[in-house]
Amino acid sequence: MGFWAKLKEKLTKKTNQVEQDEPILDQQDQQDQQEEQEQIIEKEIEQIKENKIKKTKTSETKKQEKPIETLKEKKKREKQKEKDKKVEKAMLKSAFNFSKDIKKLSKKYKQADDEFFEELEDVLIQTDMGMKMVLKVSNLVRKKTKRDTSFENIKDALVESLYQAYTDNDWTNKKYRIDFKENRLNIFMLVGVNGTGKTTSLAKMANYYAELGYKVLIAAADTFRAGATQQLEEWIKTRLNNKVDLVKANKLNADPASVVFDAIKKAKEQNYDLLLIDTAGRLQNKVNLMAELEKMNKIIQQVEKSAPHEVLLVIDATTGQNGVIQAEEFSKVADVSGIILTKMDSTSKGGIGLAIKELLNIPIKMIGVGEKVDDLLAFDIDQYIVHLSSGFMQGDEVEK
């Protein structure tokens, strides 16, 4: 079995499996569970009546029985499949262009030579993954195809090299997940330039955790941009159905650190699970921004030394290499722990996340795949690589 087949099998299993560490249940889930138990009992009673036999099940027959899939498990599995379809749809443009170019190479070259690798590097450059990542992937492919230079092997080696270059051979990918933990106040700060979808992403993230049953508070600490707080208020009222709470300043240009202080105080006193902090997006004045972030960090660390648990930089995927520059600049003024890559559904060059990971060692944590409130998803490198390469690995045409 080749690498791509193994990766696809892993993704399929992951999509179908039910995680054991499920977050706390909301009231609807609890009600569903109760109804489900009642239905199971009723079915068992009916079975006994029909057979007119009370059969005692031995431990052996119990082992042989197929486990009943609970309603909650079924809902989770269906949600996971729905998320995978969203990612696949969001990557159609990137996958189409990438697969089309790889297929052109497969028709032109039957075996790999220096000229082939030059053209392969040109194709990789077009994905916006950056020159450093391009050379890394190209060199990995060369090493993996020394003995077998057939194009079938080259394609599989390309998929493995893309995966290996991003994950450093970590098959579990655990270190790339959002650092959210139970039984603590999780504090996440979002940074990024105006226009990238920072405030929208924050609202969607609030919805993401509120839907899982967590108590979420937002600190509107972008006191510089007119309309930033109003945007959050509108989101909370009209699209989040007031499921989350907000702490805001009394006036424009107020000290953002004071908003953070008030938010932390409220979050601690009222036992919130998550505090999301919106920040100003003006990178042009790095001195002021750095001072603001340092002041916020001091206030946060007075309460929790390990916080903020995430500093997430929001990057617009359609900006290409300009997004890489933004990541470089923000990493100078903030301890960025992860990337939220927005507008993945609007770009035909989906490699910017690979470029940032290679250049700055900052992983993608979440991706925006549409305009709906639930279109912010946890990033999964398995999904990304499978969908990016499925067009040329399966031999099927990827539709636009």
UniProtKB/Swiss-Prot annotation:
Involved in targeting and insertion of nascent membrane proteins into the cytoplasmic membrane. Acts as a receptor for the complex formed by the signal recognition particle (SRP) and the ribosome-nascent chain (RNC). Belongs to the GTP-binding SRP family. FtsY subfamily. It catalyses: GTP + H2O = GDP + phosphate + H(+). Part of the signal recognition particle protein translocation system, which is composed of SRP and FtsY. This is Signal recognition particle receptor FtsY. It holds the Pfam family SRP54_N. GO terms for cellular component: cytoplasm; plasma membrane. It comes from the Bacteria. Keywords: Cell membrane, Cytoplasm, GTP-binding, Hydrolase, Membrane, Nucleotide-binding, Receptor. The keyword Ligase does not apply. Transmembrane segments: none annotated. Residues 51-72 have a biased composition (Basic and acidic residues). GTP binds at residues 192-199, 278-282, 342-345. One of its GO terms (biological process) is SRP-dependent cotranslational protein targeting to membrane. Residues 12-37, 51-86 are annotated as: Disordered. It is a peripheral membrane protein. SMART domains: AAA, SRP54, SRP54_N. It is found in: Cell membrane; Cytoplasm. Its EC number is 3.6.5.4. It comes from Mycoplasma mycoides subsp. mycoides SC (strain CCUG 32753 / NCTC 10114 / PG1). GO terms for molecular function: ATP hydrolysis activity; GTP binding; GTPase activity; signal recognition particle binding. Gene3D superfamilies: P-loop containing nucleotide triphosphate hydrolases (3.40.50.300), Signal recognition particle SRP54, nucleotide-binding domain (1.20.120.140).
